[in-house]
């Protein structure tokens, strides 16, 4: 057994596809003092049983670019490392049985073209030409992406690991991290990571394992299913939860190796060719969350008990779409864990609670297609100190502490697993884990007919339903049911009076004799204004990019109120702390839950303020 080092520049926790990708990309950037620690064996958690689909189209341009890069990387890994990956680009087909789904697919196809992807909108007949096994009787149309593909998850992970070792990284298996060590950072961030404690198995049988410490400048949490638990060791919120994920593999039915991947999201199913067999999996609308406490500590290459009753509706859908499945024998019924986040987007970046502690976890069952791009940009973030592109979609700082609550996560995971194949309607609102944060005006707004949406846990009145009308969204890609109500509100705000409840906005009190000096250093605009004056400003980074867009109100000589978007509360608070010099006399207090913010229209003298001003009212 190789002896583990006592120090390293970077320690990566977790030997799944994302951990190996981070190690690989760090070495590509010239960092060789990289140590990866895996609790059991590489891929043994969730990577090994992944379906291995490598799609390229995501919801935004930057996420699509990362998925494209993953595909390009997998296409070259075997030549670079000599390790086979099983990667092939047979394309993928997504089918639509109704006009709403087809509209969504066509919108996605238009976006794909803007992002530089090859894509075709095809008829049902053209779909069956590409996929002869398909029942097209109820199809409206489909979208074909010819460069999508699939790979072998274990092989591609081993290729990344081999590439990392070729670049100088050291990989250790059967090394369980049991503690994250921290120290005072000497800045207003207060704490930074300093290393990890590892349980090193003894060489002799029956002997207890030995605890050893590896000092490290940077630690990366790539622990997958155990990412939430590892985050807790460090005092870092990593909101993810396990769920059971199901698929079957048929007996060999002679499928051609060139068959495209099939997705029928309205039926919750996907299918791919697997050595002449067919793998059929599902993302059902209501999943089965699996608390980590029910998963054995030594879980490795494991699976859960079968649940045919839960999988049966998806299987019936699959047999309708692919009639050949009715006569196919079942070789494998698989039920195993995957980890999911509250918004179905993965978690990436430096933790706001702990300097130099990075996270890449919660891949939401698309880890294989995400790992290449996510590993690349996180490595660049680590090396350069900032992300190479806008990664707000997946930034860990978008999450709030309440979202790490086990009850919240369990309830939300019932919904989040199915979001990948749900209809992505404009203004769609979460259905689970609601009512976490409410304004003091919530009850009165509700009685007035408010239809609430959710933003970072806050229940916000998005629009008001007319009397004797239910305050509920009716989703559509056409004009939705709230248009007329919103028009009436808009007219009232212009011609009469309106009071906007902005309690969900984040609020920080910055005070102390150096408060003005600190804020003037951080803000692009001048906050040296009289008391009661509000300043609209940006926070810029050293590259001239905008980090935040907010207002700063001077309440008293040495007291300022910063008001920013609720969604960026954690991000902006972390940025503020990060940029306060050590030697100044200033304190920052998050008063978001303690203060309400109201913004008035015109016409009521009691609430009439001069523009760019503010004061407390009772």
Feature annotation, model-predicted:
Residues 4-18, 35:
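Beta1/beta-strand and adjacent pyrophosphate-binding region of the FAD-binding site
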Residues 21, 180-183, 192-203, 210-307, ...:
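Flavin-dependent oxidoreductases
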Residues 27-47:
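Glycine-rich FAD pyrophosphate-binding loop
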Residues 52-130, 266-271, 275-277, 298, ...:
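Dinucleotide-binding Rossmann-like beta1-alpha1 core, especially the glycine-rich loop
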Residues 76, 88, 97-174, 178-184, ...:
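Flavin (FAD/FMN) cofactor-binding and adjacent substrate-gating region
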Residues 266, 297, 302-437:
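C-terminal catalytic lobe of FAD-dependent flavoproteins
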